[in-house]
């Protein structure tokens, strides 16, 4: 059996990984919507994808994280299977994994959610500006 390069975040309905894993996840998991977190304009694909880039600019990071997490959580709550990705599946995808776990009640703090996300996918690496933004949003 071939090992998957992407991971299930929750209930075998929310998956995450890198951009190169999207097509495989769509095929294998019957994904309904792919959320692309990369800043650059995405290439053409054959599956349904929404572009929800997480900004690098400090003043836009929180809003872009909230928008991306909302797209994932809304699709999940609508009964859809979701795959979200950034380039490599660690930074932006890890950030959205943290927010998604908190929004869906699977963690109560950024630290707890980050540890859970890392336990699922060891590539998760939430960079400092994004961690601060997550803490501003969720650790109140």
Say what each PLM segment does.
Residues 2-81, 102-133:
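Cysteine-based protein phosphatase catalytic domain of the PTP/DSP
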Residues 79-98:
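A phosphate-binding catalytic loop at a beta-strand-loop-alpha-helix junction
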Residues 138-140:
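C-terminal domain-closing interface element
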């Amino acid at each position: 059996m071939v090992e998957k390069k992407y991971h299930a975040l929750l209930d075998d309905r929310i998956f995450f990984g890198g951009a190169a894993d999207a097509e495989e996840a769509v095929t294998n998991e019957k994904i309904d919507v792919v959320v692309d977190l990369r800043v650059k304009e995405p290439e053409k694909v054959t599956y349904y994808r929404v572009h929800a880039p997480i900004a690098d600019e400090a003043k836009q990071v929180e809003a872009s994280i909230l928008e991306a997490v909302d797209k994932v959580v809304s699709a999940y709550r609508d009964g859809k299977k979701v795959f979200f990705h950034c380039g490599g599946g660690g930074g932006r995808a890890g950030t959205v994994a943290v927010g998604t776990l908190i929004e869906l009640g699977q963690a109560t703090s950024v630290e707890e959610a980050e540890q859970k996300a890392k336990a699922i996918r060891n590539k998760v690496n939430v960079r400092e500006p994004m961690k601060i933004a997550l803490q501003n949003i969720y650790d109140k």
